[in-house]
From Swiss-Prot:
HAMAP family for this protein: Ribosomal_bL27 (MF_00539)
InterPro entries for the chain: Ribosomal_bL27, Ribosomal_bL27_CS
The name this protein goes by in its record: Large ribosomal subunit protein bL27
A GO BP entry: translation
Native source species: Roseiflexus sp. (strain RS-1)
UniProt xrefs under Gene3D superfamilies: 2.40.50.100
Amino acid sequence: MAHKKGVGSSRNGRDSNPKMLGVKRFGGERVQPGTIIVRQRGTKIKPGNNVGLGRDYTIYSLIEGVVTFEQHSRNQKRVSVYATE
């Protein structure tokens, strides 16, 4: 016999809001300083040249330029922004 009454549906019904993670500006796109490039949990993608890393691991542009994604090692991606003349 059950010690507790079956109350499945009334105890469920919680869900968190979407966090809108992912790449916001892709390789080859032009960005301004402060433009968010990637929103992520942890450093799945590492910061490269001319980008900053926020407290929540958001990668953002520090200069005006073009976004490039680089394969740094076999299992590490890096994103940089390079100025265009």
